[in-house]
Amino acid sequence: MAVASSPEKDQPLLQLQKVDSSRVGGQVLSPTLSSSLETSQPICITSPYTDLGHDFPTIPFYSPTIFSYAGPSISDCTSVHQSLNPSLFWPSRGHMGSPIPLHHSQHGQPIQSPWVEISPLDNVLKTKQDGASLPLAVVPVRHKSARRRSQESEEAVVTSGGKTDLHYCAVCHDYASGYHYGVWSCEGCKAFFKRSIQRDNEYICPATNECTIDKNRRKSCQACRLRKCYEVGMTKCGMRKERGNYRSPQMRRMTRLTSQGRTDSSSVLTGSAVVSLNAPQPSALTSEQLIERLMEAEPPEIYLMKDMKKPLTEAKVMMSLTNLADKELVHMITWAKKIPGFVELGLLDQVHLLECCWLEVLMVGLMWRSVDHPGKLVFSPDLSLSREEGSCVQGFAEIFDMLLAATSRVRELKLQREEYVCLKAMILLNSNMCLSSSESSSKLLRLLDAVTDALVSAIGKTVLSFRQQYTRLAHLLMLLSHIRHVSNKGMDHLHCMKMKNMVPLYDLLLEMLDAHIMHSSRLPRRSPEQEPEDQADAPAPPHSSGSGPSYTWTPSSSEGAGEPQ
């Protein structure tokens, strides 16, 4: 330890004032630490005791432990300390020679001094906890430069510690300014998303809809930037529908199913099913009451809110149709939840049924709107297309003709609104019978029977005879098979357009399209042991290769079954 007797040291040493022996004798100096003082600094004690016979220099005083003093430290002291006296640390007059050298290097680790570490606040708290005052014979004084360095280091610690709590923009990974539109985002992405949804901007990617969006390239492609905003969970209402982008698409659809359309506070989530306490049981409703509930559940009309300027192009038409479809899907979830008994099914079953029939429901609604407009398809009150206008989309002419033919059949049958709402509900409930449990299957069958009875009741209100009523029921049910066939063609076409990057697909529409393919790919395959026996009796697939048949699903396959390709 260096002897601090030189006046040329950088840090001045503050000496203690001399105290009259009459005031020190038998008493203990116990000054209270001032709240303005911070952590203690080493100070120096001069040796005014001339009666010992030693010429002691001014030495730095750190802790009694440096001098091998075995007394308790300040933090461990529960009683009053003795007054500081040099006789505690140095021998009496008999000692000859130079002052005792102090070797601080003998310790393996630097000894932590309680005079340096204990802050004034800690000292006061310790005094209150132990119930005894902690006497200090010296009052530590901090130099201004040391105080300034300590403050800077504390601020640096706070700053470095605060960085661990920073959030990053979910879109471009820049520093987030806050929680905007349901996710953590920066000011730039927040403002971009706000402009896009307020002005209803429609962007087209000049490349392949796979542009990289980061801090440096977020302004390079508006279409991909808006697509990523939707992918990470930005919503127009500003409420977070899903937590991050790490959930599967099915989990995000389940979140929508449980959140959208829930305005009744009595609707609660119990287990895996959503139970509405105020919703009557389907068996408790008469056919007339059930039809009335189905008519009340009908979604509102969706407007494109955009003037389609001619000549129409493939990009304009597909952009408008996919935009309308995405909006209708949101209302479809609300419509399904309003069907009596649907929310009693398991949540996974609700999602699965919607995923299997969403395009059929959209198409039967399209036919209903187009009944009074021969030769045209009314996609919305402000968007209707003739066959010539729809032919600008590659591969859409065949689907357009099938839709016009099915609409013509609906017109011939003079479909009533009561019959229409029953058929629409039957499409949803009959889309798939493979549910998660036998209990859910039983509930679904009872609900389907109730809707079928309501359809029979609606037909019975006409002036037709019993034989004509049965014939009409058969014609209406056969109409459902035509709608499913057109739906499979439409799904095939939409999937091809997506693979060719012909049109951007956003949010719910893209998820539903992917879910349709995902569910179809989960169909059971035949084992290798069974394939030779089956192939011996069946003709080979037309597109089989030399390595054997490949059983893959195509959107055009009926009932979503896998077929050899």
From Swiss-Prot:
Keywords: DNA-binding, Lipid-binding, Metal-binding, Nucleus, Receptor, Steroid-binding, Transcription, Transcription regulation, Zinc, Zinc-finger. Its main location: nucleus. It holds the Pfam family Hormone_recep. Abundant in the ovary and testes, barely detectable in the brain and muscle and undetectable in the liver. A zinc finger (NR C4-type) spans 169-189, 205-229. The keyword Metal-binding applies. Residues 522-565 are annotated as: Disordered. Residues 169-234 bind DNA. It is found in: Nucleus. InterPro entries: ER-beta-like_N (IPR021064), ER-beta/gamma (IPR028355), Est_rcpt/est-rel_rcp (IPR024178), NHR-like_dom_sf (IPR035500), Nucl_hrmn_rcpt_lig-bd (IPR000536), Nuclear_hormone_rcpt_NR3 (IPR050200), Nuclear_hrmn_rcpt (IPR001723), Znf_hrmn_rcpt (IPR001628). Signal peptide: none annotated. Residues 286-516 form the NR LBD domain. GO terms for molecular function: hormone binding; nuclear estrogen receptor activity; sequence-specific DNA binding; steroid binding; zinc ion binding. One of its GO terms (cellular component) is nucleus. Residues 1-168 are annotated as: Modulating. The keyword Protease does not apply. Belongs to the nuclear hormone receptor family. NR3 subfamily. Composed of three domains: a modulating N-terminal domain, a DNA-binding domain and a C-terminal ligand-binding domain. This is Estrogen receptor gamma. It comes from Micropogonias undulatus (Atlantic croaker). The gene is esr3.
